[in-house]
UniProtKB/Swiss-Prot annotation:
Protein name in the entry: MATH domain and coiled-coil domain-containing protein At3g58360
Keyword Secreted: no
InterPro entries per the UniProt record, alphabetical: MATH-CC_domain_protein (IPR050804), MATH/TRAF_dom (IPR002083), TRAF-like (IPR008974)
Organism (species): Arabidopsis thaliana
Key words, A-Z: Coiled coil
PROSITE patterns given in the database record: MATH
PANTHER family: MATH DOMAIN-CONTAINING PROTEIN, TRAF-LIKE SUPERFAMILY PROTEIN
Stretch forming the signal peptide: none
Chain segments annotated as coiled-coil in the UniProt record: 232-290
The MATH domain, residue ranges: 6-131
């Protein structure tokens, strides 16, 4: 396969300081037709330093001869100062003996967890990686024709298209509790519910005249499904109710306008009929006032 352009992946780890697991994995993502994931030791790996790896996802199921050559840059983001962010850039061969690379073992955890350090903002640690797949030996996880479509980024545990990340980040900033009660762990289900949420928002961003009753009815069904899954979207429900009320007013107004228009047309026709009748009456009155002719007598 040919060289793949570098792909930027973002992984936001919530409540980093409160994690009790020895190690945690990101959801898998696809770059260059290959599945990858991040591995991090939030409490260190027997030492008080952050360990962060880029790993080939599901490598145990691959054929023994698989190999992947990649250049990657792992960046632990300082959200207050870019200059203080910690980066590790390498170019490595991944294989059955070395399915993961990229430790940041010289990064003290006490520096990450320090108050106002900039690495934890609202308890969230942000990791950004740039990955460039240089060569793949063995079968691709995803064909090159579809890999560009399926490449995704992890944000708050949700797999998103790169084009969706900024919008979703803004949504979480404006509504930080939106997924606080969302408990599903399966990445496909998480992605599905997030897609449903974004589709509902996109629908409600249309003007009321572009929506019909079926759209709104399906919107309520989608909203029920989203809230049942644990999303807190009271603000979205208010918007749906507001749009429904506007749509009802619009339809009621259009119905009344049609009735008034029909009544007006009827009145116009009556006016025309009355004008015609008036002209006829005028003609008869004029004829009645005319002197009689005696030509038929004399």
């Amino acid at each position: 396969m040919g060289k793949q352009l570098a792909k930027k992946i973002t992984w936001a780890i919530e409540n980093f300081s409160s994690l009790h697991s020895k190690k945690i994995y990101s959801d898998p993502f696809i770059v260059g037709g290959c599945k990858w994931r991040f591995l991090v030791y939030p409490k260190g790996n027997n030492v008080d330093y952050l360990f962060l790896y880029l790993e080939v996802a599901d490598y145990e199921s691959l054929s023994p001869e698989w190999r992947r050559h990649a250049r990657y840059l792992l960046n632990v983001v300082n959200q207050n100062s870019v200059k203080r962010s910690k980066q590790n850039e390498e170019q490595k061969w991944f294989d059955v003996q070395s399915p993961r690379w990229g430790r940041l073992s010289m990064f003290p955890l006490n520096e990450i967890n320090a108050k106002d350090s900039g690495f934890l903002v609202n308890g969230e640690l942000k990791i950004v990686a740039e990955i460039e797949v240089l060569e793949v030996i063995g079968k691709l996880d995803v064909s090159e024709e579809t890999s560009t479509i399926m490449e995704s980024m992890d944000f708050n545990g949700f797999q998103l298209l790169p084009s969706q990340v900024d919008f979703v980040r803004h949504m979480f900033e404006k509504h930080p509790e939106i997924a606080s009660e969302f408990r599903l762990k399966n990445p496909n289900l998480r992605a599905g519910y997030m897609s449903l949420l974004l589709s509902l928002i996109e629908t409600l961003r249309q003007s009321p005249q572009e929506l019909n009753k079926v759209d709104l009815a399906e919107g309520y069904v989608a909203l029920r499904s989203i809230t049942d899954a644990g999303f807190k979207v009271d603000w979205l429900e208010k918007k749906l109710v507001e749009i429904s009320e506007k749509k009802n007013k619009e339809e009621a107004g259009e119905t009344r306008m049609q009735e008034i228009n029909e009544e007006l047309e009827s009145l116009k026709q009556k006016c025309l009929d009355l004008e015609a009748q008036l002209e006829k009456e005028k003609a008869e009155v004029f004829a009645a006032k005319s002197p009689l002719s005696f030509n038929d007598v004399f």
